[in-house]
């Protein structure tokens, strides 16, 4: 009994301390937890035996529906009214996320997973530039230093790839990964610029737009097997909704560049899961 009382007292103390976190600390914590949820994303996509359009369709459709369900549970708002409000206040956020979603799936299926995730390290730089252009917000020197280090990783990934006959192969996936970073950075800046955006609805609409785009491009919804649907359900039903709900809430408390820097954790852990499960070893430049 004494041990049970001590446990309850400790739990209450932890909740009390959490309540005293500053808004900046809450933003950092939410983003960090969200990125941890996101790290298996690349692995779950690689485990599905389907073309990229079909992957994009199911991943986006399931995620979009779950994000709307989360919004209904947490916000208790009418989904039709929420979408109507989005058209006045956040449509660009949805379009940017749709582009990021589509580019990520295309890239992860057209190049080594580690390359896609490492190239996404350009996201903090893009977010910083967009923040300066559209929000006139100055970033701390340490943030810029971290961004420069991340950019150096991009140079290492691309180093030696050109001129070696790889132009028509993996390089396409690498280039699309850069556009993925651009769209995701724009999504975060759009939220930071207008914190009143209902991010669950905005990202949910973006996911559904990506699903419609994939269907128009030739997705075959019947292609995945039963086992494939398990991975798709985990990815679209748990990983993406939880991760995006937390990550897209981050820019309401911290800068978009800071959110992008925390997302570099996926660059470290994402390729590790793919390597451990599928033995897909990153290239020498990427591994460095």
Regions found by a protein language model. Name each.
Residues 5-57, 61, 65, 95, ...:
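Glycine-/small-residue-enriched transmembrane alpha-helix faces in small-molecule transporters
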Residues 20-21, 60, 71, 264-288:
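C-terminal-most transmembrane helix of multi-pass membrane proteins
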Residues 67, 71, 97, 142-161, ...:
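Hydrophobic transmembrane alpha-helices of multi-pass small-molecule transport proteins
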Residues 27, 50-99, 126-127, 182-187, ...:
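Transmembrane alpha-helices of multi-pass small-molecule transport proteins
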Residues 59, 84, 117-120, 136-156, ...:
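Loop-to-transmembrane alpha-helix entry segments
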Residues 116-122, 190-209, 240-276:
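Helix-helix packing/entry segments at the starts of transmembrane helices
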Residues 37-38, 74-115, 120, 156, ...:
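Specific transmembrane alpha-helical segments of multi-pass solute transporters/efflux pumps
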Residues 54, 61-65, 105-138, 257-275:
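Specific alpha-helical transmembrane segments that line the substrate/conduction pathway
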